[in-house]
Amino acid sequence: MTDKKVTRLRRARKARLKMHELEVVRLCVYRSSQHIYAQVISADGNKVLASASTLDKELRDGATGNIDAATKVGQLVATRAKAAGVSQVAFDRSGFKYHGRVKALADAAREAGLEF
């Protein structure tokens, strides 16, 4: 693995351990060069409560690797999480910088009603 990826994974592991100690539901984000994925994971980490990505049928047709797509994924995962009874989450950025697509997803989820 490259040094860049190793440092990202170390940052992610450190943040996830803290969230596990606090026993909070987390909104986990993963971004690749072409897609972005978001999952709401239970406090014990055993169950995915809601998920959305640019591979979903509603979002697959448009552009998938830009800020607009990340905004749509954020709105979709927030509505699905609220339907599952989740209103408060901890934001797990998986070691990615809080910038660009990751920030757009977080802002859209906040606007749709999730509390971080």
Curated annotation (Swiss-Prot):
InterPro entries: Ribosomal_uL18_bac-type, Ribosomal_uL18_bac/euk
SUPFAM superfamilies named among the record's database cross-references: Translational machinery components
Keyword terms: Ribonucleoprotein, Ribosomal protein, RNA-binding, rRNA-binding
Gene3D superfamilies associated with the record: 3.30.420.100
Keyword Ribonucleoprotein attributed: yes
Oligomer status and interactors: Part of the 50S ribosomal subunit; part of the 5S rRNA/L5/L18/L25 subcomplex. Contacts the 5S and 23S rRNAs.
Stated family: Belongs to the universal ribosomal protein uL18 family.
Protein name (Swiss-Prot/TrEMBL): Large ribosomal subunit protein uL18
Biological source species: Pseudomonas fluorescens (strain SBW25)
Organism placement in taxonomy: Bacteria, Pseudomonadati, Pseudomonadota, Gammaproteobacteria, Pseudomonadales
